């Protein structure tokens, strides 16, 4: 279910403040955030935002194609270790 149109997109206030401060500054720095639920706005394009995945902050470079998506979509929280491999003994006995 998508968000209601009348509510508009959501972005954390602290993240917006950091993005606005970054736009005023000349140096580009990585912005750390824990707000995976924030929607990416056009003003974020060209910035690098480090999104928390539960263990560490993963840097994500924002492009125009990402506008309208959530920050959490680009940083997976679960690591896939692969399926359990079969033993050689189990396959050779059958």
Swiss-Prot record:
Coiled coil: none annotated. GO terms for cellular component: cytoplasm; small ribosomal subunit. It comes from the Bacteria. The keyword Nucleus does not apply. The keyword Ribonucleoprotein applies. One of its GO terms (molecular function) is structural constituent of ribosome. Pfam families: Ribosomal_S19 (PF00203). Keywords: Ribonucleoprotein, Ribosomal protein, RNA-binding, rRNA-binding. SUPFAM superfamilies: Ribosomal protein S19. GO terms for biological process: ribosomal small subunit assembly; translation. Belongs to the universal ribosomal protein uS19 family. Protein S19 forms a complex with S13 that binds strongly to the 16S ribosomal RNA. This is Small ribosomal subunit protein uS19. It comes from Lactobacillus acidophilus (strain ATCC 700396 / NCK56 / N2 / NCFM).
């Amino acid at each position: 279910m998508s968000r209601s149109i009348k509510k508009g997109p959501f972005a954390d206030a602290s993240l917006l403040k950091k993005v606005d401060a970054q736009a005023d500054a000349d140096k580009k720095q990585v912005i750390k955030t824990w707000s995976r639920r924030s929607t990416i706005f056009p003003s974020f394009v060209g910035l690098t935002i480090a999104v928390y995945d539960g263990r560490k902050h993963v840097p994500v470079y924002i492009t125009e194609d990402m506008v309208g998506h959530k920050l959490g979509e680009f940083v997976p929280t679960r690591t896939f270790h692969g399926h359990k491999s079969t033993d050689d003994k189990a396959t050779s006995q059958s």
